[in-house]
Design a protein with these regions (language model features):
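TOPRIM fold recognition
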Residues: 36, 59-62, 67-167
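Phosphate-handling DNA/RNA-contact segment within nucleic-acid enzymes
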Residues: 1-93, 107
Length: 167
């Protein structure tokens, strides 16, 4: 896998493990302003690119977010890297938490796909300006409370989504 890393700038290495604790890959996150913020290095080619599988309890609702760093701020959370968000099938009580990017068509499409399938989703309120959970934490927002009050499903999710999206 070393030959796949074509960068020399310092990066944060975020390990991905299987449910059994086996290392399956790494995400290398840029510290600066590189146009390539993330580099995914798969060690096990057919393993899902889901961060936190080794740390969750399936007995409780799982919160499914986009970024590994975001998942560290939430109890019982995993992060889907790359195209894994399109492949994940949440359980009945799991919650999809997409970044707060109502102008991003790809984000809107992923969120709407999950709403259409009846999954529980977070629709960020209009007063939240931050893009992701990490930014919300840095702004001293109570992310747990925001998630609890803004998790929707079915018709209510569709209605909230229609007013949230700008794409």
């Amino acid at each position: 896998y070393k030959e796949r890393i074509k960068t020399t700038e310092p990066r944060l290495a975020i390990p991905f493990f299987s449910e059994e604790g086996k290392l399956t890959g790494l995400t290398l996150r840029d510290y600066g302003n590189s146009t390539l913020r993330y580099i995914m290095v798969k060690i096990v080619d057919d393993a899902p690119t889901i961060f936190g599988l080794d740390c969750i309890s399936k007995e409780k609702p799982v919160r499914i977010v986009e970024g590994p760093l975001d998942s560290l701020f939430l109890d019982n959370s995993i992060a889907c890297a790359g195209t894994a968000f399109n492949k994940i099938i949440p359980g009945d009580n799991d919650i999809i938490i997409i970044d707060n990017q109502p102008k991003n068509k790809e984000v809107c499409d992923i969120l709407h796909k999950h709403i259409s399938k009846g999954h529980k989703v977070v629709i960020w309120p209009d007063n939240i300006e931050q893009k992701d959970i990490n930014d919300m934490i840095m702004a001293n927002l109570d992310v747990e409370e925001i998630i609890n009050y803004n998790t929707f499903q079915n018709l209510e999710a569709e209605l909230k989504y229609t007013s949230w999206r700008k794409c």
